[in-house]
């Protein structure tokens, strides 16, 4: 199983360049060249680490607290802001990979889903936890990718522990520690 995962990972690294990751923002300056490059690198690394070997599309929106609050209320009926929202296209389980036949025939890409990140939460949480905004943004992107791939943390037990372990492993691959 370890050998198979490593083989899938190496193949996924080759595929990473073929992922399509549009990043948009509805707040000034959020979609800076640096933020966009970081987000794309983190998504590609997370997908490779999880063994995703088909070209995928992940759409990213950078917003503020009021923007994410509105989306949260509209899409999830939760009347609150949050740090990150993930909207997976497929109902995957952890370790289950998107299949080539899930690709959009027009683009050849598997639409994994959307992520929405509050840049105000990024700044506030970076201050709260005493680390750089770059680290907080990277963490939220990894967290969201794992949700798109079926991970969850609704329990306080094995699901959450598994997701946290994957988050830390991927951040470690990126050289981003606490």
Locate the predicted segments by residue.
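An acidic/histidine-cluster motif and surrounding catalytic segment
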Residues: 2-138, 146-178
